[in-house]
């Protein structure tokens, strides 16, 4: 890719996040909407993507076959579901198109496929594209190094009723940031459910609690609790535009990288702090 205007494709264009992404593209300099894709059979196929997102006519018609639109974009932004994202990944890898992936819920095989594809194309893969959340992840690393060994750590997350995976990708990223800072593996210390007689809390574990209700955009709290005091680090999102803007900024940043696997900490240069 060059430093000229970057053409963006958005899959799931008719969804809540897809419409926000279209709005973000139209509001940001250096990018244009090149393609918009919906699932086959969707009544939205054939409509104008701009009118769909409420930003006026863009003369970009919603299609249903990504493989037929690869000449129209440089970077694909994907906030769909794992099985669909992996199909899109294969197409992008074949045609050397970069990707911004905000899909969550991948298993280990899916994550490995993304890592392998990054040998050929540039990919920004993050559980959360909010600037605030990624600053929180950095704060959690610092807190875990100071307090992690002697406090009880709990992560509580809340999302809208339509979210299909739990815990959220952001909650897991918070757990991984804490565990990594303490030299542990999250899979060895995570506790995802408690029910019935559980006995006392085991030292060194990281607990997770999930809420699904109403239209909550996203709330995450990491708690470091000791006897007599506790520290809570919280992020609350009130609009999906914060995620959409971060994803589009990632696409612009990715224009300077032909290949490699990155996350928002790379985009925001947080790894230097």
Swiss-Prot record:
InterPro entries: DapB_C, DapB_N, DapB_N_CS, DHDPR_bac, NAD(P)-bd_dom_sf. Gene3D superfamilies: Dihydrodipicolinate Reductase, domain 2 (3.30.360.10), NAD(P)-binding Rossmann-like Domain (3.40.50.720). The active site is at 159 (proton donor/acceptor), 163 (proton donor). It holds the Pfam family DapB_C. Its EC number is 1.17.1.8. The keyword ATP-binding does not apply. It catalyses: (S)-2,3,4,5-tetrahydrodipicolinate + NAD(+) + H2O = (2S,4S)-4-hydroxy-2,3,4,5-tetrahydrodipicolinate + NADH + H(+); (S)-2,3,4,5-tetrahydrodipicolinate + NADP(+) + H2O = (2S,4S)-4-hydroxy-2,3,4,5-tetrahydrodipicolinate + NADPH + H(+). GO terms for cellular component: cytosol. (S)-2,3,4,5-tetrahydrodipicolinate binds at residues 160, 169-170. Keywords: Amino-acid biosynthesis, Cytoplasm, Diaminopimelate biosynthesis, Lysine biosynthesis, NAD, NADP, Oxidoreductase. NAD(+) binds at residues 12-17, 38, 102-104, 126-129. NADP(+) binds at residue 39. It is found in: Cytoplasm. One of its GO terms (molecular function) is NAD binding. GO terms for biological process: diaminopimelate biosynthetic process; lysine biosynthetic process via diaminopimelate. Pathway: Amino-acid biosynthesis; L-lysine biosynthesis via DAP pathway; (S)-tetrahydrodipicolinate from L-aspartate: step 4/4. Coiled coil: none annotated. Catalyzes the conversion of 4-hydroxy-tetrahydrodipicolinate (HTPA) to tetrahydrodipicolinate. NCBIfam families: dapB (TIGR00036). Homotetramer. PANTHER family: 4-HYDROXY-TETRAHYDRODIPICOLINATE REDUCTASE 1, CHLOROPLASTIC-RELATED, DIHYDRODIPICOLINATE REDUCTASE. Belongs to the DapB family. This is 4-hydroxy-tetrahydrodipicolinate reductase. The gene is dapB.
């Amino acid at each position: 890719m060059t430093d000229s205007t970057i053409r963006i494709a958005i899959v799931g264009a008719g969804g809540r996040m897809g419409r926000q992404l279209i709005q973000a593209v139209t509001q940001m300099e250096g990018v244009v909407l090149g393609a918009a894709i919906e699932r086959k059979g969707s009544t939205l196929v054939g409509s104008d993507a701009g009118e769909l997102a409420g930003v006026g006519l863009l003369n970009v018609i919603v299609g249903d076959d990504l493989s037929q639109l690869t000449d129209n974009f440089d970077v694909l932004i994907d906030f769909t579901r794992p099985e669909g994202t992996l199909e899109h990944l294969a197409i992008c890898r074949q045609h050397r198109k970069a990707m911004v992936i905000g899909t969550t819920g991948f298993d280990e095989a899916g994550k490995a496929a993304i890592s392998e594809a990054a040998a050929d194309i540039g990919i920004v893969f993050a559980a959360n594209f909010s600037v605030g959340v990624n600053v929180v992840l950095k704060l959690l690393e610092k807190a875990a190094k100071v307090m992690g060994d002697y406090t009880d750590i709990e992560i509580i997350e809340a999302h809208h009723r339509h979210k299909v995976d739990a815990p959220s990708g952001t909650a897991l990223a918070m757990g991984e940031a804490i565990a990594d800072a303490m030299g542990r593996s999250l899979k060895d210390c995570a506790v995802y459910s408690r029910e019935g007689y559980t006995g006392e809390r085991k030292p060194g574990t990281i607990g997770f609690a999930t809420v699904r209700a109403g239209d909550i955009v996203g709330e995450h709290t990491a708690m470091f609790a000791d006897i007599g005091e506790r520290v809570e680090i919280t992020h609350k999102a009130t609009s999906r535009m914060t995620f959409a803007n971060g994803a589009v900024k990632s696409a612009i940043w990715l224009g300077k990288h032909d290949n490699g696997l990155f996350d928002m900490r790379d985009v925001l240069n947080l790894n230097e702090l």
